[in-house]
């Protein structure tokens, strides 16, 4: 009998559940003496019920019959310790998450116990308790559906009057702890995606709509913080600037993706609320004015951040009204948004002399502008003599009384710095890729691809619309005037009615053909700029490619001439690189960049995300530490030149109506001459590695000390094979190679005071930036400002030194000549054009 009494109970048994329940009922008050017993009982009950849910329904029947949930609530009331509250919330979370039986979930939710726990006044000064409470709320929300959600509501006349889960949850929506914010967002999404109409009405009715305005305010603060980080990075970059920017960008995009998830629930009023709040509290008062203004009292954001945010909002938040109204604002004058109490115009970009009468442009200005569409169209002759962005036009053409945000974006591209140009290109690319945007808005902006124009006009002609047929077969066409005017005007009226933004478009603003010419002109101007990075030029090349083919009136001989001039300059720069420090890697880089550029330009969407414009700020600021004479710097310059050349070359091919080949047209490597020095030396491998035996034909004896006080005798050779070349120091007795270095970039120089000394500059054999896996190492090397190695070789006499110098110079010439020979077909683009014509 005693053995039976001492035998332990089965942990997962009904008897154990009964025993634990009895233990809880005996507890009259929870204190330090019995809290461990209570915690263990609560934890064990959760485990037993989870086990029973999968194996024996009698477990949960007992749980219901004995009203164990009531015991949980009673224990919470009589508890004086936080740890018991934590365990109770954890027990409830485990049960709700793991119970698969619908009956079990219905029972838990059908009583008021869950709502009681939700509304219970916990002491949230304990962070651990708050975390478990939020986890409990999230667990409850995870079980919501159209049947269970009604069990947590209070209604009157079929109208929801109380929803504690939602109300209590959103109180912590803006907690400083990111994990808590994330959990609350998951809770709200679970509520929105249930699809219960009465609940939808509840969450979009006052005062619950304040959640969305607070959400936009929270997002606005994120934007301001990001702007401050961007400005600090530009002014005084630090080692952790990149990490801070990355974290801030992630936070902003997480919020925008949350907006997107909320909208995907399909609650129309929520989409409207988010649209109105974003426009009213962010886009109109901050982002747009910041494009042409500088901050006053730190309440604005910098232009680069504004460009990034505009792109991100359009790319992530898929709301038709938001996309089209944002696009419509770009046609409005800058003064329509700038309040003198908030921001002041930026002298370099803001328009001058724009006058308003009761919020509208001066009539004289409008009447003058109404004549621009026809006069501009007439001015676009076949030779491209347009007054817009022509070579004789001053760069301040957009700084006039008619300047709009659209023109500001174009001005950033044609005149701004690298980051401003890239940010503006992202905005244009995002507009082009935004499916929610009306095609007529793209046409008005000047970025609707011609294939889409023809498609729409063809549809109009097929359904019998005369204007469509006339425009389709008219060489001077360029506008879908009726659709454009009605849709653009409709969104402009909404801006005035809802937000008080008055914008009356002059005649020129209604001429898409003028705008298309402006965009093309701006992009061609960008591609002709020499102070812009290749990365940004590739972005401009992608956008230009999307707009091909053009009509002759938009992409004309002037543009071709500009591109040809820029191409010739770039070709000359590339030719100089053949004589530079890295000719042995030039063809490899060219082949690689050709494939990359082809992939980028022919891609249906940009290969980079808008955040790249911010994340590169830290890297660009650190470039100031690089040594100007370093081979690393020269390698970067060579890669930049190759990238720009490849882009311009491929655009030239596109302009001829030809498709891009997979590989650039270059000659194959030439066979090594039997009379070459490398052949005479017996070099039968691609690289003379240490240990290789060579014939010391033409070798010149020399001495060099790689360590202080330790001079060694070597036989000196300079060898080239194709585009490769090496400086070789071999053992004078047996010709065994001991040391090698790249021939290219060695810059031989005879010492002026010691004519027996030969100075050589020794660069690395490879360029780390070409290997993505070594990008981190490369950045560290650059930041340390490392310089190239230096060799000083001492020869027996002046004649030997001159002989070695001549050997190096001659082999370098052979090496560079081979690179130039292989690239010759690539440089014969003009001859190829004539053949095509």
Curated annotation (Swiss-Prot):
Transmembrane segments: none annotated. Residues 368-378 have a biased composition (Polar residues). It is found in: Golgi apparatus membrane. GO terms for cellular component: extrinsic component of membrane; Golgi apparatus; Golgi membrane. It comes from the Eukaryota. InterPro entries: ARM-type_fold, CLEC16A/TT9, CLEC16A/TT9_C, CLEC16A/TT9_N. Residues 42-192 form the FPL domain. Residues 366-386 are annotated as: Disordered. Keywords: Golgi apparatus, Membrane. Its main location: Golgi. It is a peripheral membrane protein. GO terms for biological process: anthocyanin-containing compound biosynthetic process; cell fate specification; flavonoid transport from endoplasmic reticulum to plant-type vacuole; positive regulation of vacuole organization; vesicle-mediated transport. Disruption phenotype: Abnormal pale brown color of seed coat (testa) due to low flavonoid accumulation levels. PANTHER family: PROTEIN CLEC16A, PROTEIN TRANSPARENT TESTA 9. Belongs to the CLEC16A/gop-1 family. Involved in membrane trafficking and vacuole development through membrane fusion at the vacuole. Required for membrane trafficking machinery and accumulation of flavonoids in the seed coat. This is Protein TRANSPARENT TESTA 9.
């Amino acid at each position: 009998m005693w053995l039976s009494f001492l035998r332990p109970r089965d942990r997962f048994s009904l008897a154990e559940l009964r025993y634990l329940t009895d233990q809880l009922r005996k507890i009259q008050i929870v204190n330090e003496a019995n809290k461990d017993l209570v915690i263990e009982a609560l934890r064990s009950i959760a485990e037993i019920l989870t086990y029973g849910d999968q194996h024996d329904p009698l477990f949960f029947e007992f749980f219901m019959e004995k009203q164990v949930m009531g015991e949980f609530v009673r224990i919470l009331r009589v508890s004086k310790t936080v740890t018991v509250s934590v365990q109770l919330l954890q027990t409830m979370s485990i049960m709700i998450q793991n119970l698969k039986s619908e009956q079990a979930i219905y029972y838990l939710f059908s009583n008021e116990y869950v709502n009681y726990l939700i509304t219970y006044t916990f002491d949230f000064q304990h962070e651990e308790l708050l975390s478990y409470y939020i986890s409990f709320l999230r667990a409850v929300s995870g079980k919501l559906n159209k049947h269970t959600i009604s069990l947590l509501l209070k209604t009157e006349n079929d109208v929801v009057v109380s929803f504690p889960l939602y109300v209590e949850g959103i109180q912590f929506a803006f907690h400083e702890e990111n994990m808590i914010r994330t959990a609350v967002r998951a809770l709200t999404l679970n509520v929105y995606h249930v699809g219960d109409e009465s609940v939808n009405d509840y969450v979009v009715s006052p005062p619950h709509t304040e959640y969305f305005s607070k959400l936009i305010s929270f997002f606005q603060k994120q934007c301001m913080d990001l702007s401050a980080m961007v400005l600090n990075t530009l002014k005084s970059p630090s080692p952790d600037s990149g990490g801070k920017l990355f974290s801030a960008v992630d936070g902003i995009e997480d919020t925008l993706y949350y907006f997107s998830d909320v909208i995907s629930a399909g609650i129309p009023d929520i989409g409207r609320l988010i649209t109105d709040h974003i426009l009213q509290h962010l886009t109109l008062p901050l982002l747009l004015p910041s494009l042409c203004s500088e901050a006053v009292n730190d309440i604005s954001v910098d232009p680069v951040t504004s460009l990034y945010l505009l792109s991100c909002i359009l790319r992530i938040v898929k709301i038709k009204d938001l996309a089209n109204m944002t696009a419509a604002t770009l046609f409005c004058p800058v003064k329509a948004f700038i309040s003198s109490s908030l921001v002041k115009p930026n002298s370099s970009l803001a328009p001058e002399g724009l006058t308003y009468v009761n919020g509208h442009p001066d009539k004289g200005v409008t009447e003058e502008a109404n004549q621009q569409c026809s006069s501009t169209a007439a001015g676009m002759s076949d030779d491209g003599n347009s007054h817009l962005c022509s070579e004789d036009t001053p760069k301040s053409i957009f700084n006039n009384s008619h300047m709009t945000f659209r023109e500001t974006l174009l001005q950033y591209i044609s005149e701004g710095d690298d980051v401003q140009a890239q940010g503006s290109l992202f905005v244009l690319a995002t507009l082009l890729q935004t499916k929610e945007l009306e095609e007529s808005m793209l046409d008005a902006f000047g970025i609707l691809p011609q294939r889409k124009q023809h498609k729409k006009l063809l549809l109009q002609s097929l359904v019998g619309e005369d204007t469509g047929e006339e425009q389709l077969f008219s060489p001077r066409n360029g506008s879908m005037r009726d659709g454009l005017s009605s849709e653009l005007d409709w969104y402009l009226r909404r801006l005035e009615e809802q937000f008080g933004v008055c914008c009356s478009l002059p005649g020129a603003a209604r001429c898409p053909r003028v705008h298309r010419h402006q965009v093309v002109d701006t992009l061609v101007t960008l591609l002709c700029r020499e102070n812009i990075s290749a990365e940004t030029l590739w972005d401009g090349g992608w956008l230009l490619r999307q707009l091909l083919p053009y009509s002759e009136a938009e992409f004309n001989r002037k543009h071709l001439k500009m591109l040809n001039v820029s191409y010739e300059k770039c070709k000359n720069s590339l030719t100089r690189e053949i004589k530079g420090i890295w000719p042995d890697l030039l063809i490899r880089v060219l082949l690689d960049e050709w494939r990359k550029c082809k992939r980028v330009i022919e891609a249906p969407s940009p290969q980079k995300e808008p955040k790249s414009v911010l994340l590169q700020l830290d890297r660009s600021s650190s470039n100031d530490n690089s040594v100007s004479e370093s081979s690393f710097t020269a390698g970067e310059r060579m890669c930049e030149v190759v990238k720009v050349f490849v882009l311009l070359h491929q655009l030239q091919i596109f302009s001829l109506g030809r498709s891009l080949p997979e590989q650039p047209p270059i000659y194959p490597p030439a066979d090594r001459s039997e009379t070459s020095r490398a052949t005479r030396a017996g070099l039968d491998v691609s690289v003379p590695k240490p240990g290789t035996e060579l014939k010391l034909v033409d070798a010149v004896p020399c001495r060099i000390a790689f360590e202080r006080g330790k001079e060694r005798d070597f036989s000196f050779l300079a060898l080239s094979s194709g585009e490769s070349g090496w400086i070789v120091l071999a053992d004078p007795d047996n010709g065994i190679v001991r040391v090698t270095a790249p021939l290219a970039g060695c810059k031989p120089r005879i010492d002026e005071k010691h004519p027996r000394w030969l100075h050589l500059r020794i660069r690395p054999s490879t360029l780390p930036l070409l290997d993505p896996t070594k990008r981190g190492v490369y950045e560290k090397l650059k930041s340390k400002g490392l310089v190239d190695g230096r060799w000083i070789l001492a020869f027996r006499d002046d004649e030997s030194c001159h002989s070695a110098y001549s050997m190096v110079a001659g082999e370098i010439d052979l090496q560079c000549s081979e690179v130039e020979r292989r690239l010759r077909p690539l440089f014969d683009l003009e001859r190829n054009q004539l053949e095509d014509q």
